[in-house]
Regions:
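Extracytosolic ligand-binding ectodomains
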Residues: 2-12, 27-394
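N-terminal signal peptide c-region/cleavage motif recognized by signal peptidases
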Residues: 20-23
Length: 394
């Protein structure tokens, strides 16, 4: 008969605990953060930028001991390919299988708009680091689980108009927009901004994301007397606008939403890509704050291909995702748990965060789910395949 001493029983218990803390168990104890974004196709570069911004923030948080008593954060990504249906499948997998505490996503407004009803129903906080459609955060849900650290169409549209009128003395606006919910959102916003000034567009033209010849639409805008084009579209079709203008020989100012920044714009558009001025929320060029210098150093250390600001592109993807992840971590800490309702309330309890883009002071409230405002935007253009603030040629 085997007799167990007290010491033996303690040893057995310790071994049992050790066995329980297998890699799988430890992984389950991490706090999973989901990301649904384009990781392939023309906008893959932007999806990678979001990944890098979030990863740097997560590394910082984990190095400080993690959250909620030492739990580390783990990033789990899924590729939506810019397709709303695939985005929904990816979001459901991350919510129901991976059990993410917070879901980030993504690049395209149609994808985000398809995901928002799911996160509101399942009470999973959703942070948008790119998609600018006004309805992503202003979705009418109560309670609303969608937050954003990015541009907002309604504000961008006013900024585009003000910039065009100040910079190019624009008085006859021609709208050239992608034919999807993002384009519709901006058509309403630009038209409303013009109406506030007693104006209206001289023409509104639409294009499909797959179009390669926009000469017919642009010719109609030229015939209508447009003296400035207001462009809303992602990388590929925005490049086709530039190439179509080249074929027409029409030299007209182009003021754009930030779609051109999302990928291989200069490669696809050619040398006149520099003629497009587009909105951004951040640039790594020029004098950086201490946070900016720290992030650049961390990016260089983690990604050897990054040698300087030229290689951090698109900058807005990195910056928005970095600040968004830090704010989400603060919300989890304020919540004291990974329960969705508590994290949502945690966002409202954030008092201050000195971030990469700016210092955020009470960035969220039940009526304000967008952390960035119009005065946080900057205007940029491509110079020698680099995204630089307009007027900066370093």
């Amino acid at each position: 008969m085997i007799r167990f001493t007290r010491r033996t029983l303690i040893a057995v218990a310790a071994a049992t605990v050790a066995a329980t803390l297998s890699p799988l168990a430890l992984a389950a104890d991490t706090i999973k953060i989901g990301l649904v974004t384009a990781l392939s196709g023309q906008s893959a570069q932007a999806g990678e930028a979001l990944t890098r911004g979030m990863s740097i923030a997560i590394d910082e948080i984990n190095a400080k001991g993690g959250l909620l008593g030492g739990r580390k954060l783990e990033l789990v990504r899924r590729d939506d390919e810019g397709n709303p249906a695939k985005g929904v499948v990816a979001a459901r997998e991350l919510i129901f299988k991976e059990k993410v505490a917070v879901l980030f996503g993504g690049l395209d407004t149609p994808v985000s708009m398809a995901i928002v009803p799911i996160v509101n129903q399942e009470k999973v906080p959703f942070v948008g680091p790119w998609a600018a459609g006004t309805g992503v955060t202003r979705n009418g849900a109560n309670p609303n689980f969608a937050f954003r650290v990015s541009a907002v169409d309604e504000l961008v549209d006013k900024a585009m108009l003000n910039y065009a009128q100040k910079t190019f003395k624009s008085s006859k606006a021609g709208l050239i927009l992608v034919n999807n919910p993002w384009g519709e959102s901006n058509e309403k916003g630009i038209t409303a901004a013009l109406a506030e000034k007693g104006q209206k567009p001289v023409g509104v033209e639409k294009f499909e994301a797959s179009d390669v010849d926009l000469v017919p639409q642009l010719s109609r805008l030229k015939a209508a007397g447009a003296d400035t084009l207001y462009l809303v579209g992602n990388v590929g079709p925005s490049a086709q606008v530039v190439k179509s203008l080249d074929r027409m020989g029409w030299k007209v100012p182009v003021v754009s939403h930030w779609g051109p920044a999302g990928g291989r714009f200069t490669e696809l558009a050619g040398p006149n890509a520099k003629n497009v001025h587009f909105v951004q929320t951040f640039s790594f060029f020029g004098k950086l704050s201490p946070v900016g210098e720290k992030v650049v150093a961390e990016l260089k250390a983690k990604y050897p291909a990054i040698k300087g600001p030229d290689d951090i592109t698109p900058a807005v993807g990195v910056a928005n995702a970095y600040d968004g992840m830090q704010l989400a971590a603060l919300a989890i800490a304020k919540a004291g748990s990974t329960q969705g309702d508590a994290i949502r309330e945690g966002f409202y309890k954030i008092d201050r965060y000195d971030g990469l883009i700016k210092s955020y002071v009470k960035p969220f409230s039940p009526s304000v789910h967008d952390a960035l405002q119009a005065d946080d935007y900057v205007w940029a253009q491509f110079i020698d395949n680099r995204i630089l603030p307009v007027g900066l040629t370093q």
